[in-house]
């Protein structure tokens, strides 16, 4: 069974809801027509606050390895902390939080998603939205098009940090 993924900024793609925890397959990522890079890293963890340090560390390590400047790495870590905290607080019990860090030539794209009981995890105009747009060069949200219910609905946030040489 597939549902339509509603990308709030870019049309949509399909999501295979039969995957465990309602996770999306690689081909279902809202990459705006781009394929995931060969250096992309995906980490799936229980949607619990105890896992925030691990997620921040992963993003910080990849950002540093990718030669983002110190401030850009710090901003990206803070943005990921905010995104993941919001997702964890809205996640269904026993949900899995999925984090994908995709280094590209001119940017690092981070996508976080989880099965949530609401689509109002991060709403444009909210305090969290302002924090995220101050920390990342681009912020987008997406969900799988289903209304949140007992089974939840996949909600995600994509952050983009551009390299200093490419107009940061």
UniProtKB/Swiss-Prot annotation:
Source organism, top-level taxon: Bacteria
BP terms from Gene Ontology: negative regulation of DNA-templated transcription
Sequence positions that bind ATP: 124-128
Ranges where the record places region Disordered: 1-31
MF annotations from Gene Ontology: ATP binding; hydrolase activity; nucleotide binding; sigma factor antagonist activity
Induction / repression: 9-fold induced by starvation.
Stretches with biased composition (Polar residues): 7-16
Gene disruption: observed consequences: A double rsbW-sigF disruption shows no effect in the presence or absence of rifampicin.
Keywords from the UniProt entry: ATP-binding, Hydrolase, Nucleotide-binding, Transcription, Transcription regulation
Subunit description: Homodimer. Interacts with cognate RNA polymerase sigma factor SigF with a possible 2:1 RbsW:SigF stoichiometry; this inhibits the interaction of SigF with the RNA polymerase catalytic core. Interacts with anti-sigma-F factor antagonist RsfA with a possible 2:1 RbsW:RsfA stoichiometry; this blocks binding to SigF, thus indirectly activating transcription. Interacts with GTPase Obg.
UniProt function note: A cognate anti-sigma factor for alternative sigma factor SigF. Alternative sigma factors are held in an inactive form by an anti-sigma factor. Binds ATP and GTP, may hydrolyze both.
Entry's family note: Belongs to the anti-sigma-factor family.
Domain remark from Swiss-Prot or TrEMBL: The cytosolic domain interacts with sigma factor SigF.
Name the record gives this protein: Anti-sigma-F factor RsbW
UniProt lineage: Bacteria, Bacillati, Actinomycetota, Actinomycetes, Mycobacteriales
